[in-house]
Amino acid sequence: MAFFQNTRKPEGLGGKLMVTMMNHGHASLSAFGLQHIAIQENASCLDLGCGGGANVKKLLARSPQGHVTGLDYSEVSVAKSRKCNAAAIEAGRCEIVLGNVMDLPFPDDAFHVATAFETIYFWPDLAQAFAQVFRVLKPNGLFLLCNEASGADAKGAKWASLIEGMRVYSSEDLRRLLRQAGFSNLKMSENPKGWLCIVAEKEATPQPKQPL
């Protein structure tokens, strides 16, 4: 099952194939998630775990006068995402950064919107990562999180057994961790396939962080 390890961190030829597959395979999930969030035309957006860059391209379309940053810790993903969004990068509307969600290389209050599609399964410390997302969002900024596996059926457990370092979180786990990071006004949506979408807000007057 070595090929499937590329879902966690694409590397080599297998990784190049995987990010291409992800750009197509995650299209329906991103469409499901993006319908739940309003994005201003001039928004500054951050796509975490940007993979092959397809969702960066969608965010650019949703904010035609804004700027989109993609971040991934895979060099293969960064290269593919830069190629996918070359025109926007040339126009100064896009940047793809090699980095880690555990220590985001951005200043406080930098983005209106942050997104994470099919990626948090592989974040080693979700509490720390969510705190980083909270930090870089502007007041009233939104965090959109979308997963195909929500722990509601055996599908997620099967994939977690095949892919080293993968963990599937329940909706309650995610609610608790997001609130602990300071997020509020959480809105959760699920579809008949079991896909999960959560939109969380960084209020202008943040709520007290809740203990784990």
Model-flagged regions — what are they?
Residues 127-139:
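A short glycine-rich, Lys/Arg-flanked "PGG" loop and its adjoining helix->strand segment in the class I
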Residues 4, 10-23, 27, 142-199:
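C-terminal alpha-helical "lid/dimerization" subdomain adjacent to the S-adenosyl-L-methionine
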Residues 112-125:
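A short SAM/SAH-binding and catalytic strip from SAM-dependent methyltransferases
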Residues 24-43, 58:
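Conserved alpha-helix/loop element of class I SAM-dependent methyltransferases that forms part
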Residues 42, 137-142:
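Short glycine-dipeptide loop
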Residues 46-103:
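Class I SAM-dependent methyltransferase SAM/SAH-binding core
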Residues 102-113:
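A short acidic, Gly/Pro-enriched loop at the edge of an enzyme's catalytic core
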